[in-house]
Amino acid sequence: LGTLQSYADDDPNFFRFDQREGALKISTNGQAVHIDGQSFQALTGCVALNGARIEAGAGLTVKSQFPNCYIFCFSQDVFPTLNVARKIDAAYDDWYSITDLRKFIARTAELLLGQLKVSDFENTDDVSLDWLGGLTLQVVHRPCSYDGRELVLDQESIQQAVNASEDMFRWPFSKELAHSEFQEYRILFVLRDAQGQIVPVKKNLK
């Protein structure tokens, strides 16, 4: 398994390299935009006072990064070839087909949970074996979209942007159009603590 961060830091010669994996950028379209508090919170994750109105300046840019998670990616190409495999990694000399996706995901999730160590996590100061045993694994899988990772706001497009932001998993499944040739299907393995919060992992591969 890779991680969002390992793909972002990969060899630029590999097709899977993507410096902006899991990133979201929101910017205004050269003019100030007035946003209600609820929409502001949906777009940025920042709490606003109930009933507040916020003016987003003409030069506003908000960048956010999805927590680092384990991922497994493959091509949906119905006629896979070695050439497709080598675009991902030049060292690949073979490829295989996944014939039962549900079984593949279930077994991979089982193996991942069995291999987790305290050292796999970013914030290890508060991590204990008891804490480790209380983690749950959420698996989200679907095809990647290729409509980019930037929302450009004007007064007319605010609601459209809010609707897009309500899908918290949109960003780890969003890619730039340049990657569309791969027809990527992605499996995201999200670890959550006892409070349901996503726990970021280190970029190391599994």
Q: Language model features by range: what are they?
A:
Residues L1-K206:
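NAD-dependent ADP-ribosyltransferases
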